[in-house]
Amino acid sequence: PMSHPTNTVVVSAPPLPGFTTTLFVQADPDEYAVVAPLMDVSGVGVVYTQNSTSRPWHHAAGPAQATLRRSADRNVLLDAGQYAGKNRRMAQVGIDESWVRFQQRDLGLPWAMADSGYCARGDLPGVETILRSCGKTSGNVIAPLPVSKYLLIEDADKVRDLIEKQDRPVALIVEDGADPFGARGVAAGLVHLLAGGAPIGLLRADTSALGALAFGAPFAAIGTRPGLRHIPMKG
């Protein structure tokens, strides 16, 4: 879990416009029946996650629509999950704008999340591709950055510069075999990104999500199971 570095100012940010919470649960679409009552009681949001690169969009659409019907709050995000698995997409491929439009027009979500591919160690061009592609979309769009933990350890300055050159909120998703924030330098890298003031959330996390919120993230999500608390290593 992410610990607070010493001598830092802890600030919390308001939710993104259209949301009423900063804390989300990251869940499989099949977990709707478990997650929905939790949302009713606690007011948290949900990130429905497609964990197969072969599953069609509508797999998560049903639970998303059911959640929107159930609650006056619209704290729902869809994570396409294209960055994970044996056949995962890489960042340089770009994004599918029809997936963005599907979330906006068909589902009426307050925020659409692009279906970004994975950014490997040192893949700053991949980060740039995702941010540039998301910048060309219209409406409320979050740019997911699914990254190797080494991009936070080794290239936090450069990643922060790229994020601050564009105007989309960013959702950071970090790869590791277990807990990425257990590795030296990862938490410091995230805090460095958040210190820039750009809206950066953390998805697929454990209690590190609470640390991210304390340091100014406008949204963060805790996974319902270990595989949804980080990007599993490929294999």
Regions found by a protein language model. Give the residues of each.
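N-terminal active-site wall of soluble small-molecule enzyme domains
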Residues: 182-190
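Glycine- and other small-residue-rich loops at beta-strand/loop junctions that grip anionic moieties
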Residues: 175, 179, 201-202
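Short catalytic-loop micro-motif centered on adjacent basic/acidic residues
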Residues: 23-25, 199-202
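Active-site beta->alpha loop and helix N-cap motifs at the rims of alpha/beta catalytic domains
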Residues: 2-176
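Extended alpha-helical scaffolds
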Residues: 180-181, 207
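Glycine-enriched alpha-helix->loop->beta-strand junction motifs that scaffold or abut catalytic
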Residues: 40-44, 108-109, 166-170, 189, ...
